[in-house]
């Protein structure tokens, strides 16, 4: 019995050690990628812009994402949220839809995965709703910090999400933060991930209305047919098969802080008593 206990204990230590090594490895990988993106952006802003690399007949690659795209052609953008650990490349593998659930940016197997876009979403067109998944890791990495948005006070100071595609800088304003269950026919289940392109104004309005039925708090922000959305999704552990979801609408395509500020200030004005 003692020998068995020792063996079990040793195995647990090895697993803990492996998990620690994996966490450090992934942190280093994504820190390096973030540094590369930041350095490229700063260099491009401070000097004469380098010759741009075409992405399509109409569009050029953003200089800060060009090197990453050359490293991995599955890259579709970069997502970041102020005062969180969310600062990651975003991937999409259409032929292997959930590939990045268990693979990192370098395509090596990883429990941490890498944020990725649902396979039926078109980032460049774009679809009416881009669904982006990320793990909720216990060390606070990937999309774990979406938990912060359960607190209205945090949302009040962080109303926008930056999601730059390969060709465009884009800012999104948060419409709703909620949790729901998936993989069930329960009446309280909301299959938000099935909404990608609105077939009609009514379909879009129905999706927004459902988002507005479930939130932790009222943001005072809504969306209308023609708006482009992103939906961030991660695991939520208050019940089985629960998901934490953040839905936001695009407010600018050039990363303009003024537009984001204007929307945030308008929402703040709506909250103030007359």
Which residues does each PLM region occupy?
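Solvent-exposed, non-transmembrane regions of membrane-associated and secreted proteins
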Residues: 11-274
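Short, small-residue-biased leader/transition segments that mark boundaries at the very start
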Residues: 1-13
């Amino acid at each position: 019995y003692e020998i068995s206990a020792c063996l079990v204990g040793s195995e647990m230590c090895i697993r803990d050690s492996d998990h620690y090594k994996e966490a450090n490895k992934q942190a280093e990988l994504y820190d390096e990628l973030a540094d590369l993106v930041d350095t490229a952006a700063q260099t491009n802003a401070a000097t004469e812009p380098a010759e741009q690399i075409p992405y399509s007949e109409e569009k050029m690659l953003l200089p800060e994402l060009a090197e990453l795209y050359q490293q991995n052609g599955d890259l579709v953008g970069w997502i970041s949220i102020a005062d969180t650990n969310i600062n990651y490349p975003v991937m999409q593998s259409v032929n292997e839809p959930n590939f990045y659930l268990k693979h990192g940016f370098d395509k090596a197997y990883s429990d941490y995965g890498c944020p990725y876009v649902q396979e039926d979403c078109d980032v460049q067109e774009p679809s009416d709703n881009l669904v982006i998944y990320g793990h909720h890791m216990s060390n606070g990495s990937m999309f774990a910090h979406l938990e912060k948005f359960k607190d209205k006070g945090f949302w009040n100071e962080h109303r926008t999400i930056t999601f730059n595609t390969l060709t465009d800088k884009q800012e999104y304003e948060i419409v709703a933060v909620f949790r729901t269950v998936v993989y069930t026919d329960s009446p309280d289940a909301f299959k938000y991930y099935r909404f990608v392109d609105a077939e009609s104004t009514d379909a879009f309005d129905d999706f927004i209305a459902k988002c507005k039925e479930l939130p932790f708090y009222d943001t005072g922000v809504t969306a209308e047919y023609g708006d482009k959305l992103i939906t961030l999704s991660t695991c939520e552990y208050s019940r089985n098969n629960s998901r934490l979801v953040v839905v936001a609408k695009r407010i600018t395509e050039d990363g303009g802080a003024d537009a984001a500020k204007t929307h945030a200030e308008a929402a703040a004005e709506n909250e103030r008593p007359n």
